Amino acid sequence: MRTKTQKKSQEKTNLNLSGYNRMMKLITQTTDLEIALATLRNSDFVTIDTEFIRETTFWPQLCLIQLASPDTTVLIDPISQDIDLKPFFDLMVNKKIVKVFHAARQDIETIYHLGGVIPSPLFDTQIAGSICGFGDSISYDQIVQRCTGYQLDKSSRFTDWSFRPLSEKQLLYALADVTYLRDVYLLLKKQLEKNKRTHWMDDEIAVLLEPKTYDMPENEAWKKVKGKIKKPRELAVLQKIAAWRERKARQYNIPRRHIIKDECLIEIAIQQPKDEADLKRLRSLNKNWDKFSIAHTLIKAVHEGLEVDLATLPALPKHNPLNETSSAVIDLLKVLLKLVANENGIAPKIIATSNDLEKIANGCIKKNIPAMNGWRYEIFGQKAEQMLKGKIGFYLSNGKINTKQL
C-alpha cells in the first residue's frame, strides 16, 4: 500500500507529465541550449540521464541527454550538427549544483569520453538505495515504483536512439527517466540524513569521480581479462597482449571481444606462440578473426611479454584451499554479517563480499579490504576483528541469534 506521501508524489509527477507535450522540444542549437541551461543554474540539484548505443563500438555513441531541475526539464540532441555541448559540460562541473544519476557509471563514461569532464558533486540513487535498504543494484523502474508507487513504461528502452526523428513515445520515456528521479533523490537524501548515513556513499562516489574508472591505462587492461593463469611468464605475456587488444579496440572503435576474446588471450598467454603459424594452431581462435590483418602485431606483443623481467611483475593471486578452521571461521563471519545487515536494514553483500570474508578468515584485516574500511568497518569490520580475537560470541534467545561481549 502506498503512503499519502507516495500518492502525492505520483499525482505531482503525473501533473508534470501531462504538460510534456509543450516541453518535449528537442534542443538542436547552441543558442537554445544556453537559454535552457540558464534556468537550471539556480537549482540545488539537476537529475541527469543519457541514451546511447555501443553494441558495435568501443566508445559509447551519445544520442540524447535528459536533464531536470525541480521545475524544469530539458532534452538535448547531441547528434545535431548545429549544437556545441560546452554549456552542458560547464554545467556538469558547476560545484553549486548536485548532479543526480541512477547507476551513474555508464552515463558518466559517455560524458567523460565526449567532453573530458566528470560531473561533480555527484549523487547516485542506486548507491543511495542500497544503503537505504532497497537491495543491491536496484533498477531505476524498481526504485521509482517503491518510492513513488508509479510503474514506468520501459518498452522504449531498447529502441534505436540514433535514429531521427525521435518519436513522442521515446521522448516521454526519456523524460520519465529524469522527472521521477527528482522524487527518488529527495526521498533518499532525506532518509540518508535522518539515519546519518550520507557519508556511507563516499567510497563508492570516489570511484565514480576517478578518471581511471572510465579511461583504464593500457598496462592495467590484463586485470579485466577473465580466466586463470598460473605462471609469472604467462602473466607477463598476458599483460602485453591485453594492452595490445586495448589499443586496437580503441583504434578501430570496436568492442574488445571483436578484436579477440578473453579466452583467446588466456590461451595465447599460456601457449606463447612464436609466429603467425603457431597462432593459427590455437583452438580458441576463429579462422576469420584477423579481419584487420593485425596478427603480426599480436605476435610482437607476445615477444615483448617473453622479454619482461619477471622481477618487475606483481605477485600472482594465490588460490589456497581453505582448511577446516578457516571454513568454520567463514561460517561464523557469515552469521555476524547477517546479524549486522539485519540491524542496519541493508543487504549483506553490500557490506562484505565472499572474497572479503575469506580474506578476513585467513587473518588478513588490512584496510584495503572494503569490509575493513570506512562505514563498513564501523558496523561490521570492527566486530569481525573482535570476533577473531575471541571478544564477541553468539547466543540463542527466543529462537534468535544475538551477539555479546565476552
From Swiss-Prot:
Pfam families (alphabetical): DNA_pol_A_exo1, HRDC
GO MF, any single term: ribonuclease D activity
Gene3D superfamilies recorded: HRDC domain, Ribonuclease H-like superfamily/Ribonuclease H
Residues in the signal sequence: none
SMART domains: 35EXOc (SM00474), HRDC (SM00341)
Cellular component annotations (GO), alphabetically ordered: cytoplasm
E.C. designation(s): 3.1.13.5
3'-5' exonuclease domain residues: 26-193
BP terms from Gene Ontology: tRNA 3'-end processing
UniProt KW keywords: Cytoplasm, Exonuclease, Hydrolase, Nuclease, tRNA processing
Chain ranges of the HRDC domain: 231-312
Primary localization: cytoplasm
Record's subcellular location: Cytoplasm
Catalytic activity as recorded in UniProt: Exonucleolytic cleavage that removes extra residues from the 3'-terminus of tRNA to produce 5'-mononucleotides
Cofactor(s) listed: a divalent metal cation
UniProt keyword Nuclease present: yes
Domain of life of the source: Bacteria
Family: Belongs to the RNase D family.
Annotated PANTHER family: RIBONUCLEASE D
Function: Exonuclease involved in the 3' processing of various precursor tRNAs. Initiates hydrolysis at the 3'-terminus of an RNA molecule and releases 5'-mononucleotides.
Family annotation (HAMAP family): RNase_D (MF_01899)
Protein name: Ribonuclease D
Encoding gene (name): rnd
